[in-house]
Amino acid sequence: MASSSGRVTIQLVDEEAGVGAGRLQLFRGQSYEAIRAACLDSGILFRDPYFPAGPDALGYDQLGPDSEKAKGVKWMRPHEFCAEPKFICEDMSRTDVCQGSLGNCWFLAAAASLTLYPRLLRRVVPPGQDFQHGYAGVFHFQLWQFGRWMDVVVDDRLPVREGKLMFVRSEQRNEFWAPLLEKAYAKLHGSYEVMRGGHMNEAFVDFTGGVGEVLYLRQNSMGLFSALRHALAKESLVGATALSDRGEYRTEEGLVKGHAYSITGTHKVFLGFTKVRLLRLRNPWGCVEWTGAWSDSCPRWDTLPTECRDALLVKKEDGEFWMELRDFLLHFDTVQICSLSPEVLGPSPEGGGWHVHTFQGRWVRGFNSGGSQPNAETFWTNPQFRLTLLEPDEEDDEDEEGPWGGWGAAGARGPARGGRTPKCTVLLSLIQRNRRRLRAKGLTYLTVGFHVFQIPEELLGLWDSPRSHALLPRLLRADRSPLSARRDVTRRCCLRPGHYLVVPSTAHAGDEADFTLRVFSERRHTAVEIDDVISADLQSLQGPYLPLELGLEQLFQELAGEEEELNASQLQALLSIALEPARAHTSTPREIGLRTCEQLLQCFGHGQSLALHHFQQLWGYLLEWQAIFNKFDEDTSGTMNSYELRLALNAAGFHLNNQLTQTLTSRYRDSRLRVDFERFVSCVAHLTCIFCHCSQHLDGGEGVICLTHRQWMEVATFS
């Protein structure tokens, strides 16, 4: 359908202006202060109705209600099995976090690292909580979840077996901030058991709102020590994992394979004239330590100056130890670094700071879950984000360079020295939302990733709205992340200044999941989601007014009789005959059902009936819609692919945003991801009715109408 210069546009306004990503939100709507005040007033200790102390809170499988591990479990408040419980004994330290039997060392290693930074820890564990003054059996913690900080309230009933805490505990037996933090995390995700198995960076991100990277040491370790030193100096949280293909086991040197460790420090010492790079690590189990070179009992410490030795070496079986970098590289496979956001770090003293954009999205089967292969027919339907990098990195003075020797680790490599090409370093982080909570339903993390394409200047104007598959092959791929089944997939990209298209995807077309995409850079950038403005061409709303063929008009009069108007069943009979010629071009009859005919009466008639002049207008619409449908019914099967519904609606004169297109696709496609002619007619008639109604409130029938998101979705979906 040709477009007219006139247009009806729906402008969406935010009814919750001022609610930013940094604003604290109450998980389950529970206010710590309100609950505490109510409990103190009533004299009754808090019992959390949203996370009841019982079998479901423990788990669903190995910790399920009938499991061996769940037998004999009692839920007890600390004062019921501890003489003088304290929330915090003096200061919080990394020795406060000791692992129990849950298998969540990834979480505990991250918590241990967090204790090194009191300012960060105070954000997660708000001060002013204890078991003495104003105790009401309620505590709260603040955790980051997919772009928002959540305040999570818990009661202090903890799972106890044979008089001992089942899960995390403190080395100081009467300290309980760590077990209660673990409970808050379990509540956020549905149960304790869903915390079994994970990656340290996942907890790092949830504790800080930062962005996590995984460094694969077997691929390249050049520049690692410098990267770690600078990461720790910038208050990044750092961990390491020794991978295992047969579960957790202890090596002869005292390391636990398949286990997560915290990296808590770096130091350079001289052994004679040889420079030695040392890393300080901590094992959450506490009692199992490295026994090789530079371990607590290693004689090499005796060769160092007393002042240096006393500053570094603490001989205690607390799970913390030093090891040389070359030994670390022999025994560990990955390093995780979580760089912190400006929201947590505060303004940069140099005035630079970080630039961050966060987007929320969803892959929907049949709409925008197009898979990861750029040459696939559905790849173009994936969500798309336009990234513009405006300023190149600054020059770096670091001598030690490597794959991690750049921004966020060992400083930013820049363009000036040696005439190097200007580069912009940016971190792209793709997060699958809420998949850990879905473990209880048998679901797990999908394999996901993203592509980065460069947009040449001559095509830049074409990427203001979702584009078809015809344009994507014209773009050069600038970078891509690995496909991974982790919650967080992060890639450090080094790109030239310019314009880029970021396309996140699942590995397989049709997989469904919610996601968060974040863009981090120290230099200025802009990022926007590729989306359409909601509008309709005025000509598509006016519709053609075609004279009816004599035979069709006579048939109308015969069916209408003395009433001179058709009801729904009569309209169905008329359309069945009128659309007969179209059946010669398809293997599937183009029938219009009774329910759709009732809808057409609502849109084009008086609600219950249709006069001749109204049918004349409807028939003009149907002929145009049929021509559009035929264009997208390439195999003459009588259906079109639901992934192409957006393009068909564009051809009909309707331009819709991603949210509405997703809603309509889910509503009008069938289980085979196909849209037949009747469903297409119903969808387009639905939109015609909406925009015609809106245009009546505009001068001349065209212009802009402002609606809130809620008002628009209510109008657009008739909800």
Swiss-Prot record:
Keywords for the protein's UniProt record, in alphabetical order: Calcium, Hydrolase, Metal-binding, Protease, Thiol protease
Organism: Homo sapiens
A GO MF term: calcium ion binding
Region Domain III, annotated ranges: 342-540
Domain EF-hand, first and last residues per copy: 620-655
UniProt region (Disordered), positions on chain: 393-418
Protein name, as recorded: Calpain-12
Function: Calcium-regulated non-lysosomal thiol-protease.
Residue ranges, compositional bias (Acidic residues): 393-402
Annotated region (Domain IV), positions in chain: 541-719
Protein's gene: CAPN12
Family from the record: Belongs to the peptidase C2 family.
Enzyme Commission (EC) number: 3.4.22.-
Lineage summary: Eukaryota, Metazoa, Chordata, Craniata, Vertebrata
A biological process from GO: proteolysis
